[in-house]
Amino acid sequence: MLVRIPQVLNAEQLAMLREQLDHAGDAWVDGRVTAGYSGAPVKFNQQIDERSEAAAQCQHLVLSALERNPLFISAVLPNIVYPPMFNRYSEGMTFGLHVDGGVRLHPHNGRKLRTDVSATLFLSDPASYDGGELQIEDTYGVHSVKLAAGDMVVYPSTSLHQVKPITRGVRVGCFFWIQSLIRDDGQRALLFDMDNAIQTLNQTNADERARRTLVGCYHNLLRQWSDT
């Protein structure tokens, strides 16, 4: 399930984040330092050092925004969110086809985190750079994603994906992974559809008993499928 989440960051938050990143200096390092065995040969970008003060401040801003975003919570059903990371692609940089690693170590507590959902939060105006599309492959084909600054896309971490080469300008972004309460993408998609239906019914004069029944089905499925 691929879901676009608009305006995760408002203009003020976006400006604060870009101010931090644009003046991060030596905190920008070779992106291959965090790449796995298969990803390193095709990864050519820069990342903010996860241990830097710039990373900590930017992570706090993004995580605070996610906690207040109902669409993110509904679509992802987050259990554990990996601390957001930040990357930069300048002219000629790219990240070839790869699948994200299935398990990562949380940098703050060392615990293992299963990567169920991948997220990319766009931080650059799409008119400021050419190329840099996030291409995600699934059974329906190839989806090319290039969103407005502040918008985010989430998709199954099982997906083969790539960032196309930059031919002009600079693309700055935020990326991270989520261990969901529901590890199966099909089950998450079903619960997401049910939640959307419930929210629609809440805004109408739908039969209250029928609405309560649907809410009960949602929570009983969540209880049955949840890993926690």
From Swiss-Prot:
Its cofactor is Fe(2+); L-ascorbate. GO terms for biological process: DNA damage response; intracellular iron ion homeostasis. Its EC number is 1.14.11.-. InterPro entries: Oxoglu/Fe-dep_dioxygenase_dom, PKHD_C, PKHD_hydroxylase, Pro_4_hyd_alph, Pro_4_hyd_alph_FE2OG_OXY. 2-oxoglutarate binds at R171. It comes from the Bacteria. Fe cation binds at H98, D100, H161. Keywords: Dioxygenase, Iron, Metal-binding, Oxidoreductase, Vitamin C. Gene3D superfamilies: q2cbj1_9rhob like domain (2.60.120.620), Rabenosyn, Rab binding domain (4.10.860.20). SMART domains: P4Hc. Binds 1 Fe(2+) ion per subunit. GO terms for molecular function: 2-oxoglutarate-dependent dioxygenase activity; iron ion binding; L-ascorbic acid binding. Residues 80-180 form the Fe2OG dioxygenase domain. PANTHER family: PKHD-TYPE HYDROXYLASE YBIX. This is PKHD-type hydroxylase Rmet_3078. The lineage of its organism: Bacteria, Pseudomonadati, Pseudomonadota, Betaproteobacteria, Burkholderiales.
